[in-house]
């Protein structure tokens, strides 16, 4: 199906029964996702996303449920680097990424939603402005996607009667930070991990180190 076929299919939706239109719409989105994956695979210069070992339909459903709950309750944390008028667009892109893609797709599509400059505090304590780092979109996309992915894994583990999840390195690092290296291979209570990533207080020091920016760590089912 080429881009003209997709356009024709979309226009035809309005003339089809609701069930058929919904199925066709889903098929179109899946084809677009496959096309993106194929084009991405042919470009080895792209930065690699984290390796999400349990990023399957079941985990995606649980992760989306977590995101939708945050948005509905007003608990969603929007980065200060997002333009205030772009938060809703970013939430939509994040949901789309969780449903079909990964953090790299989110980075590529959210880059234009960031501010150009941000406030900074100098060593003397003075306030100034500085250009947002080039890696800002990567850090934002990776951090948010991985956080909801981990929440999805933890929620899935609980629903499936599993007691724990395991921390693993989702991105190769030749010189991992000592505090990150200590976490690799540890098994943590799934409920405690979920509570912490939802913003609740927990006591386990290991759990408190999950979700830190640019750590390269994630969790998987055991």
Task: Go through the PLM ranges and name each one.
Residues 212-214:
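Short, solvent-exposed loop/turn segments at the edges of secondary structure
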Residues 11, 15-16, 29-32:
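Basic polycationic patches enriched in arginine
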Residues 35, 41-210, 222:
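Domain-core detector
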Residues 217-218:
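Long, His/Glu/Asp-enriched segments that create or flank divalent metal/ion-associated functional microenvironments
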